[in-house]
Amino acid sequence: MSGPRLLHGTVCVPSIDQALTLYRDVFEQTVVHTGTVGKVEAEAWEAPALTGAKSVVMQPPSGSPVYLRLIEQPDPAGYQPGTHYGWAALELSVKDADAMYTRLLAAGTPIIAAPKALSFTDMLYPMQARGPGGEAIYLNEIRGDLPSSDLPMAKCWVDRLFIAVMGCRDMKASLEFYHALLGTTTGGEWEMPYSVINISFGLDASTAHKLATISDRRTVLFEVDQYPVKSTPRPQAKGGLPQGVAMIGVKVDSLPEGANWVVPPIHRKEAPYLGAMVGVLRGPDGELTELVC
């Protein structure tokens, strides 16, 4: 490996069993580990209340080494999905967005936006849904690469997580933080109407928002969205994690020196780390990011 790559997206949900009906049954992800959150793991996240919480780790049937992890915790008071800073969405590569839309409707999954062709390219055909923890899930039928980036076409019904999306108070500050941390660059910047944000905040459909991508050469890692001024920090229970997309894991060639770790990096045996060194930090809006080496 050369350069940072996504390793996992972790989602906190009120019911593991309910979440599995979407991620395992509808998305057809393979469960590779079922267990509970360990004490060391919970302490690394500053979430001691999650010690013993149910946890499931899944992998796409393609075998791509990018994982989804579910952790069970109750929804906190004041949680309004889509309106808080921090990790907001997971973008997954899918074989057939229209078929996925039909299947999600039949399953009763909340739809944010139906599949829609994009004005600037015919290589992407995305839709968006809302998951059981309030997480936004972008399901993108990739038909080819873009001029500035290589994208993973799905090799199975739902393939790997390929972009993690964050909502932030200050897009520039978030870009600078992650570029300094990961050695990345800004892949592109745009200002456009964004249905996911406008629906969440009750804004007019034509309201434009700034967004940018964080890339390692031709690989996009993150999308960074400038959230409206009325956005709020994500509420979370004492000793718990943020609900919805709680953290993102990034595999790196080496751990950065002098990083402001939540706890010093340690070897972690549990999935999805399997013996790797893992360090945990907080970004500009308090979002948790794990660096894995």
Model feature map: region roles:
Residues 46-48, 80-83, 154-155, 203, ...:
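Short consensus segments that form the blades of beta-propeller domains
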Residues 39-44, 75-80, 145-150, 195-199, ...:
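A short, acidic/glycine-rich surface segment
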